[in-house]
């Protein structure tokens, strides 16, 4: 009963640039029904997240689809260097927002193309930069995304590693003439927009996940976003995983994400206290 994932080609939000991705469907899919769609994201910009070779379960997409979802991976403008300098530099100076419009437009195009996609039930999730993007997406387009899971997200790149922000967002240089000899003093500024600034926009269901031993993206990123959501009087969910570093992937973590989408996109409440494996 195995079905091959489908390669898809769509346009970026500019209506010109071609974007490429992969779509996964339930093996027992009924094409006369409507299915929620979930996009698994990672915006780069240092690598391409879209599978380019065969594996049994690309980034967990295949197994997630079998629970009753359409699952997609798509590469966005700015996501990698392999398509040339202009493509890769699209996000320079816009590190928070550059992939968001493409992502939304991709889902809208696929819903136009395939009648089985339900645009009223759209989910998004990602890890690390993907967690950053998932949170930014549901806070930027709160009427479009109904559910988001943001794991280990670098939600405030002003406290992330400087090489990341300065490389991919850029640094502004200011000149100021000083003294009688018109000497020039230079100052540098790197201020990157954050998801924290968007917290007041939340309407859907948002799950934040972080490990308390993450030495790559410190848990402070998630705590800052959680605090902003609380200050905005928003309901959200938070999971702190004890002893976990940046690379999450335990069965508990995987099933936590599955449970969240099943309950909030499929409307199936799972009341068992035990975190059973979902196959």
Regions found by a protein language model. Give the residues of each.
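Non-catalytic accessory segments flanking enzyme active sites
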Residues: 1-33, 51, 55-56, 62-66, ...
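Active-site-proximal cap/loop segments of hydrolase catalytic domains
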Residues: 60, 73-279
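Conserved long hydrophobic alpha-helices within structured protein cores
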Residues: 16-18, 36-42, 102
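Flexible, active-site-proximal loop/turn residues at the rims of small-molecule/cofactor binding pockets
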Residues: 27-28, 44, 143, 154
């Amino acid at each position: 009963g195995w079905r091959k994932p489908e390669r898809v080609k769509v346009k970026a939000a500019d209506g010109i640039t071609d974007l490429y991705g992969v779509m996964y469907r339930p093996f027992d899919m009924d094409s006369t029904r409507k299915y929620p769609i979930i996009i698994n994201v990672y915006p780069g910009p240092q690598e391409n997240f879209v599978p380019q070779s065969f594996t049994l379960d690309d980034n967990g997409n295949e197994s997630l689809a079998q629970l009753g979802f359409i699952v997609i991976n798509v590469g966005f403008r700015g996501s990698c260097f392999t398509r040339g300098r202009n493509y890769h530099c699209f996000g320079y100076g816009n590190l928070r927002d550059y992939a968001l419009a493409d992502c939304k437009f991709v889902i809208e195009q696929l819903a136009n193309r395939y009648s089985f996609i339900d645009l009223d039930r759209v989910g998004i999730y990602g890890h690390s930069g993907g967690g950053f993007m998932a949170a930014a997406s549901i806070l930027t387009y709160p009427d479009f995304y109904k559910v988001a899971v943001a794991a280990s997200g670098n939600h405030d790149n002003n406290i992330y590693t400087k090489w990341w922000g300065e490389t991919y967002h850029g640094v502004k240089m200011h000149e100021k003439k000083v003294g009688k000899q018109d000497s020039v003093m230079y100052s540098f500024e790197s201020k990157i927009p954050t998801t924290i600034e968007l917290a007041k926009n939340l309407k859907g269901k948002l799950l934040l996940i972080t490990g308390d031993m993450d030495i790559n993206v410190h848990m402070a990123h998630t705590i800052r976003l959680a605090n902003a959501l609380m200050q905005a009087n928003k309901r959200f969910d938070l999971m702190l995983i004890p002893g976990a570093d940046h690379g999450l992937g335990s069965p508990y973590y995987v099933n936590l994400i599955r449970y969240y989408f099943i309950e909030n996109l499929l409307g199936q409440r799972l009341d068992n206290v035990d975190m059973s494996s979902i196959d």
